[in-house]
């Protein structure tokens, strides 16, 4: 068993990274930054300027904003100024009302909001908000983490300044993880210390079940659950249940439903993907509560571990990371050993590496379905002691080095892809 001080560090890490969120976390983080700047200003802004990194722009362009029936940044910014409370963190817009949305539309129509690309920055997650009213100016900056404020100022008075060249590398207190340590923590930690992970099941399963009753996004989850043609082709089984629950929760979230989900590493979709395949497999196969708790812990902590070297935002679709976690959790529930769990990870990396992120949007449900179906395939292969070998592609004999290969491709190798994707998104013709 891992020593208690290190266990406490890892538990604190999970509690930082697995948190509730309403709506896509990129526009919500922008709304949070607006809320902080507005609170600092102390009055309703007359003008709001947003300067954002390319990845924030990409992830906020086509996604629904909770409770508004609208997509994109302008309404998120307007509501952040009108009703946002920074203390709510990633639930900053939970007090939104129809009246607030109507007022937000007026603010947008008044041309009070401007949005631009922040040039000459290294951070992939960067949000700078400048609010002005009655000659006063308030500035708030979030960088590197969706709730990580690094600068707050009112006029010439600096209230917070963590702007340094190592802003994104200030995680010295984070525990050093590898896959073996992740596995040991998940499988040996006293149960009462990690029971809190069950909250991921409660929130994310509720989101899926709410989605089944509504009409959200492309309705992939609902169709997979109830379509006769789907049942004739795929049947009704644990595999199709995993696909329908995971995609349904994503359908609702990307469409802007006012439904909280438990996120992972700043992403609600990653939280959904790390949770629901594991929950559905456990329930369909009558696994014990302890087995579910340990499998969910393994899934979420694996995703956190991979994101440590990948970064918050990248050109790589986050479902690759989160589905790798759920594949580990499913393999564990199947009775897999640590070796078989490493096989599942290797199989995932061999399959899904390179799937691009082209922003948060309703069609993310399709990518999540691809990710979790691959998670199931990888677990099945692993249980048969089948693993992609190190003579194939980017796979290394050492699973942690394979993970580094994945994250190097996502964080370094796909930078030009990221730029091209954003260029296409900002210049394409839309209906």
UniProtKB/Swiss-Prot annotation:
One of its GO terms (molecular function) is L-cysteine desulfhydrase activity. Pfam families: SDH_alpha (PF03313). It comes from the Bacteria. One of its GO terms (biological process) is L-cysteine catabolic process to pyruvate. Belongs to the UPF0597 family. This is UPF0597 protein BVU_2091. It comes from Phocaeicola vulgatus (strain ATCC 8482 / DSM 1447 / JCM 5826 / CCUG 4940 / NBRC 14291 / NCTC 11154).
